Amino acid sequence: MEKYNYIWEKILKEISKIYSDEVFNETFKNTKKVYKYENEIIFILAENEFIKNKIYKIYLSKINEISKSFFKENLNFKFITKKEIKEEKIDNTNYNIYNYGNLNKKYNFKNFIIGESNKFAFEMSKKISENKEIKINPLYIFGNVGLGKTHLLHSIGNKIIKNNKDKKVLYVKADEFIEDFINQLKEEKIENFKLKYRNIDVLLMDDIQIMSEAKRTQIEFFKLFDYLYLNNKQIVITSDKNTSELKNIMSRLISRFEAGLIIDIKKPDFKHRINILNQKMYEFEIKKIKINKEILELIASCFVNNIREMEGALLRLFNYIQTYSNEIDLNIAKEILKPLLKGKMNNFKNKSYKKEYLEKINIIISSFYNIEINELLGKKKHKKYTLPRHISMYLSKKLYKFSYNEIGKFFKKNHSAISKGCKKIEKNIEQNTEFKKSVDFIIKKIKSKEETEEI
């Protein structure tokens, strides 16, 4: 242990030279203890989950860089919290190298947030992990990046091992599998490769689509797949594509995937995203930090593509709050997240920002038509005022998906009046090329303002 404490102390010393005292004290002050060295991994005790994730996301590459420059060897660092030690009792357990050497214990079924978009994938994954009889084989889960596929893979592995510590579970990313195969091939140790991957009970393969350009590896994986399948070993595969969309993957491999159960994971809906954010706040263990409902709604509304985007936004807020303040409001949150929010604010459904959008749209339109804002919003029936007024209604609907009722409240008009105004503009655009050019120009101005001010 003395050797590894020295290594970590040396790395910390170099980190303190690179970063400010504020950054160092905030992140590394309480990460001075090496917890243990096991399976060629140096375990460092982190203050909490938030600090641990922060180090992984921001500083791990620098830590590895410093390590290589001073010690001339590839050292593996893993950060662990007291909570994880207590829950898993990892200090008293000697797991098979196939298992906890490559499974992430923070992923489990308990902290996987279920919604309509992932419910079936969750249920089938759990069923596989609990059943001794293999009935679903292979299980193929696909969906966009950051929707929880990897979480489910690790959850399956962790649950199987918890139920039966003698089970040999191997989680591997497709790119790691390819690299391993190539290295063993070069060193003429292909039998070692086969022994490693065939001497298992469960194979969890992540991101199979990466194998698309690795023809030789595909052949070897096909042989492995058949060997495991025929010997009644469980196989679970994830991808960002459905089997029908996989390109440059051998047809006989695809047919093997399609012989099992194929499940997709879709994007989570708004309510589901809020639940995920609440879970992330709990995981980060930041008890004194307050993030109100409006701010969570901001994140959930704007970051809709994947969970990692939301987590990144939440981490950014935590960093700011931890450094400067224990509490922030919506306006401050919007400013902190500004670099991440470009082109996304139109998704935000908060009432105050809806008003802000409409106001800024009207500033651009009134300037273009050389009329006053109060005239644009007024009741004058002259075409000079009604045309830009209707354009504002139309663009509020088209660009920002406001409902007729929402637009009506702003203009003090009923649903029918807003609907008629929008339809008039649609008709004019179809019939009048010059008018269409004017509307397109206004849209361009609005989007330009969006990029510079992030309305």
UniProtKB/Swiss-Prot annotation:
Keywords: ATP-binding, Cytoplasm, DNA replication, DNA-binding, Lipid-binding, Nucleotide-binding. One of its GO terms (molecular function) is ATP hydrolysis activity. Residues 102-321 are annotated as: Domain III, AAA+ region. One of its GO terms (cellular component) is cytoplasm. Its main location: cytoplasm. InterPro entries: AAA+_ATPase (IPR003593), Chromosome_initiator_DnaA (IPR001957), Chromosome_initiator_DnaA-like (IPR020591), Chromosome_initiator_DnaA_CS (IPR018312), DnaA_C (IPR013159), DnaA_dom (IPR013317), DnaA_N_dom (IPR024633), DnaA_N_sf (IPR038454). It comes from the Bacteria. PROSITE patterns: DNAA. Residues 322-455 are annotated as: Domain IV, binds dsDNA. CDD domains: AAA (cd00009), Bac_DnaA_C (cd06571). One of its GO terms (biological process) is regulation of DNA replication. It is found in: Cytoplasm. Pfam families: Bac_DnaA, Bac_DnaA_C, DnaA_N. Residues 73-101 are annotated as: Domain II. Residues 1-73 are annotated as: Domain I, interacts with DnaA modulators. Domain I is involved in oligomerization and binding regulators, domain II is flexibile and of varying length in different bacteria, domain III forms the AAA+ region, while domain IV binds dsDNA. Plays an essential role in the initiation and regulation of chromosomal replication. ATP-DnaA binds to the origin of replication (oriC) to initiate formation of the DNA replication initiation complex once per cell cycle. Binds the DnaA box (a 9 base pair repeat at the origin) and separates the double-stranded (ds)DNA. Forms a right-handed helical filament on oriC DNA; dsDNA binds to the exterior of the filament while single-stranded (ss)DNA is stabiized in the filament's interior. HAMAP family: DnaA_bact. Belongs to the DnaA family. Oligomerizes as a right-handed, spiral filament on DNA at oriC. NCBIfam families: DnaA (TIGR00362). This is Chromosomal replication initiator protein DnaA.
